[in-house]
From Swiss-Prot:
Residues 1-38 form a transit peptide. GO terms for cellular component: chloroplast. The gene is DJC76. Its main location: plastid. Disruption phenotype: Altered root hair development and reduced hair length. Residues 346-385 are annotated as: Disordered. The lineage of its organism: Eukaryota, Viridiplantae, Streptophyta, Embryophyta, Tracheophyta. This is Chaperone protein dnaJ C76, chloroplastic. It comes from Arabidopsis thaliana (Mouse-ear cress). Expressed in roots, exclusively in the stele.
């Protein structure tokens, strides 16, 4: 790791002893005002943490803002106020302030953090595709999404392996070796821009991660298609990315007791930083003198006063991790989600009709539906429709039987005249017309009664919720 350069002239009076272990050496640089601490052991460094987040400032803060944040935290972390844990916290604060107040050290720290930012979110596993092939297979299919024009040919030839993501309309491998090798080769040969490649299995995860960072736009089929603006070539950067990731992993695995002390001190400072944030907020009430002097330090605990902005970020990250975990467990069920189009077999054009009509050259893409995709709301709606059909039919059948039963006793007596005219007289005297009219009438009456009951039930449920 690049050693940090500190200036002894900016060292606060509280740090009478330099925070290096006995196994560390002080190496003097030519300038008498600057020296650096090189660790000869595997002890951790303050640069492993986000110092801007630690001080509660932005990365664009100037030197005066850094100094104000440092002084505000140092007042709360002083050993006379915070007790014994305040000693470690004061050391961490001094190191952070010295690093960020020096322009050269801050620039080197920002560059190091930018390198670590490139690795943020990378887990060493593929993001989009799942492995469906044999474990002995060392090849994998990969789509250069920046180069892809969204022709759908790969998804039509090997529909289990390739899919079209709905955000930009580009092809993507969602299941490795889910189709026979012959179909995958056919899909590679059918690509008009040669954006599908066979890569090493060990390079699949970093390639997909680097591809997710590339800017993309919606594809436009036609002459002069600008499919995307590439920032860098992922095939060239994959080896460098793997080297940086291996170096970062080897550094993070070397944890010592000094790192445990630093982590505890950093978390305590963060709790104080959050406390100061809430105390200075115009939307919060002023704290009492008792709470003003209260500082409870617990090892490996988070902030006492939570920061809503940080909490929202954590919740969003947890939801994203949970969603990605569920999607990986589904395997080839990627094709069932709403993020991809799944082309139907009927849309596959015939080989002898390549120069056909416009309709055949633009196959429609449909989404497969499965019974497992049916939502609980749709099942409740189906049961509701079944009840609507069942109850009115029952009332109509009962009415038909009652009218027929009454008509059997009045068969001998018929009316000779009716106020409604001849049509009404024929209906009254005809038993079959009476039965039909009674069935239709009571069917609608039953349907209206059912709607009324359901409306009352929904109103009661809304009041309960």
């Amino acid at each position: 790791m690049t050693p940090a350069i500190f200036s002894p002239t900016t060292l606060p009076p509280s740090t009478a002893t330099w925070p290096c272990s006995t196994s560390q050496k002080l190496i003097t640089v030519r300038s008498p005002l600057k020296f650096k601490c090189r660790a000869t052991s595997s002890s951790s460094s303050i640069t492993d943490f986000d110092l801007y987040d630690l001080l509660g400032i932005d990365r664009s803060s100037d030197k005066s803002q850094i100094k104000s944040a440092y002084r505000a935290l140092q007042k709360r972390c002083h050993p006379d106020i915070a007790g014994d844990p305040g000693h470690d916290m004061a050391i961490i604060l001094n190191e952070a302030y010295q690093l960020l107040s020096d322009p050269i050290s801050r620039q080197a720290y920002d560059k190091e953090q930018a390198k670590l930012e490139e690795l943020r979110g990378y887990t060493g596993k593929p993001i989009y595709s799942v492995w469906c092939g044999p474990e002995t297979e060392q090849r994998a299919a990969f789509v250069d999404e920046v180069k892809c024009v969204g022709c759908l040919k790969c998804a039509l030839c090997a529909e289990k392996t390739f899919a079209i993501e709905t955000a930009y309309g580009r092809a993507r491998v969602v299941a490795q070796w889910a189709d026979p090798e012959s179909k995958i080769k056919e899909a590679i040969e059918a690509c008009p821009v040669d954006c599908i490649s066979m890569v090493e299995r060990s390079d699949l995860a970093p390639l997909e991660f680097l591809m997710s960072k590339q800017p993309r736009g919606n594809v436009r089929i036609g002459v002069g298609n600008t499919v995307g603006e590439r920032v860098s070539n992922v095939f060239v950067d994959v080896k460098k990315f793997q080297e940086r990731y291996a170096k970062a992993m080897s550094r993070t695995t070397k944890e010592t007791s000094q790192r445990e002390v630093q982590i505890s001190a950093v978390e305590a400072i963060r709790s104080i930083s959050n406390w100061l944030y809430w105390r200075s907020s115009p939307y919060t009430k002023p704290l009492s003198p008792e709470s003003n002097m209260s500082l409870t330090f617990t090892k490996r605990k988070k902030a006492v006063d939570p920061d809503i902005r940080k909490l929202q970020d954590v919740v969003a990250a947890m939801k994203q991790a949970d969603q990605s975990g569920r999607t990986k467990e589904k395997g080839s069920a990627y094709l069932l989600g709403e993020d991809y189009w799944s082309p139907s077999n009927a849309a596959l054009p015939s080989s002898g009709n390549n120069n056909g009509s416009k309709a055949s050259s633009n196959p429609q893409v449909t989404r497969k539906t499965f019974p497992s995709e049916e939502k609980p709301t749709s099942r409740r709606e189906n049961r509701r429709q079944f009840r609507i059909k069942k109850f009115p039919i029952g009332t109509a059948i009962v009415a038909v039987f009652l009218v027929q039963y009454q008509a059997s006793y009045r068969a001998a007596s018929e009316l000779n005249d009716h106020i409604g005219g001849s049509l009404a007289l024929s209906i009254v005297n005809s038993p079959w017309q009476q039965i039909l009219l009674a069935g239709v009438t009571w069917y609608f009456i039953g349907a209206m009664l059912l709607q009324l009951v359901e409306a009352v039930q929904h109103k009661l449920e809304d009041k309960e919720t």
